[in-house]
């Protein structure tokens, strides 16, 4: 094993243990053993290409499936991105860097021509690792499996990334379909399909909104107020004053458009559905069934038509009256029937 090989080269048990290559039992009567026994070892390098640790994948069905070197004087896993030493120049050329969930994802992407991929090492993406990625690309692409674990990892990255956002530097996201990891997706769909996903990313600001609203019901004022409170509390964590201000504006836009005007969106959708019925009715008229002569139809002005729609909305949705009462006063209601 590795221990025997290193011992034959004069490396002491103490040095091997300090580098995380062997484990020394607390019971000194037991012999030290290889930390990565029965595992495929993957070298982890620093930015200069020097080996500072190892990752190990189990051969067989044992647990844990993946194992990294313990932290040592050379290796702090919160600061290191796997493959950054190889990916850096390629990322500069591609003007992008892909941050995956693990080093096996990076290996798969490299095999299919995406040599600008990196990954954290057994932890959620940290602030230090985001800062390292920003040195290469101001808006890294974070690639996650489309399963529950991938979504949870994405949410954790939002929590880590928000406080350190700064002008010109952010994160964008891509989620692979059908709960696939990059290796599975590339085997099934190939290089071009993955490249297409990279061109259809979700910006952090939009994912922050989705994090707080997706799958939730907000059809009462109290629920809407809670969503606004939660979103604004998260935005308040952004340290950069300018970026925080723009995020507040963007969230207010989401609140106005998706919480305040959802009613009007639904009305437009219903109107589009109704237009299909009207077109069908007109085709029936053209066949001579129940056609009404044009001269017999009453002429209605556009202003009166708009007013009818507004009044109908107020009848069916009286909660809108208080919100739009002042604007309603601006209408000139000359039609006696409508005034009543």
Residue ranges and their predicted role:
Residues 2-140, 153-154:
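Phosphate-handling DNA/RNA-contact segment within nucleic-acid enzymes
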Residues 46-48, 88-97, 124-140, 144-340:
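A charged alpha-helical hairpin associated with nucleic-acid processing machineries
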